[in-house]
Structure formats: C-alpha cells, structure tokens
Regions:
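Phosphate-end processing signature that detects enzymes handling 5′-triphosphorylated RNA
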Residues: 1-173
Length: 173
C-alpha cells in the first residue's frame, strides 16, 4: 500500500535548504499501461516493474525487480514519453529541526511517539517536462497523511489532481 501526498514546488530557491546537501538518484521511467498503471523504472543502476492500482492518495503498489536486459526490452514497448528526473531524498525532521520557522510542519506528538519519520522525495524533471518540481511524502497510514500540516514552502497540494501523476505526465502531448 502506498499512501502519499504530492506538492507542486514553484521555485527551488524558496526551499529552506540546499538540495546539494542531500543524496540524489537519477530516475528514468516509462509506462506500459496507464489504467491500471504498469511502469518500468531505472533507479540509478537498479531496475523495477511496478503495478499501481487506481487512486490518488492511497494506492496498492507492487514492485518486482528486473535486470537491465528486461528493462531495455520493455522500454521499447513503452507508451508516451520516457520520464527522466533527479530525485533528492530529504529527511523532514532534519529540516524542521534546523529551521525553527518550519516547526508547524512537524507531525503531532502522538505520531512522533510512534517513531514516525518522514522523508521528502523531491523530483526535478528533465527534458520537455522541465522546469517541473514535484515533492512527495510517503506516510505509514492514512491518519498520518491527512493530519500532516505541510509548510508553505512545499507549495500547492496536488495530491488529488491526477494531472501530476507521472503516468499522466507521460501521456501529455
């Protein structure tokens, strides 16, 4: 089960941190089908086939490993554009601890007591989708996702807009 919220970041300069301070990976993904979603992804030098059910904030997700040869074979059969992006992974606790003005983005105490740690996955799209910046936060459960108060710098919450699903972006003309 994947439970996530997605945000549209307008300007990387508005972020309260420097992305260069965090690790990143190069992603390439393509879609064999968009309803249901069947995706292939190259994540640095790892390869995956993913199935995602319908949904916006909550979806079933299954990942299967692929080898490079299988990935390249399936890539030739992809529909639409092949999406390329750089993904930065940023621990949200680190941001809220370092920037007192961001304290309002913290989880409520009952979630902190459960040991919930959240990570921001910031995608910087390349090619004809640039300059698009999307941030995703994956949550352990629906209650945590719904109660999370996003800081202003995350921008517009586009979780419920299918336009910002990568599967939709792959089909845009």
């Amino acid at each position: 089960m994947e439970i996530e919220r997605k945000f549209l970041i307008k300007d990387l300069h508005s972020l309260p941190f420097s992305i260069e301070d965090y690790p990143h990976r190069e992603l390439e993904q393509a879609y064999l089908c968009t309803g249901p979603v069947v995706r292939i992804r190259k994540d640095d030098e790892q390869y995956f086939l993913t199935y995602k059910s319908k949904g916006l904030m909550i979806r079933e997700e299954y990942n299967l490993p692929l080898n490079r040869q299988a990935y390249l074979h399936l890539r030739e059969k992809a529909d639409g554009r092949i999406i390329q992006k750089t993904r930065y992974v940023i621990p949200l606790d680190e941001i809220t601890d370092s920037f007192p003005s961001q304290k309002e983005s913290r989880l409520s105490p009952q979630f902190k007591e459960k040991g919930v740690s959240l990570f921001l996955e910031l995608d910087i799209f390349k090619g004809d989708l640039a300059p698009l910046f999307l941030a995703e936060i994956e949550f352990p459960d629906e209650e945590t996702a719904r109660s999370y108060q996003a800081p202003d710098w995350l921008g517009e919450d586009v979780t419920h807009l299918s336009l910002y699903h990568n599967s939709t972006l792959s089909q845009l003309k």
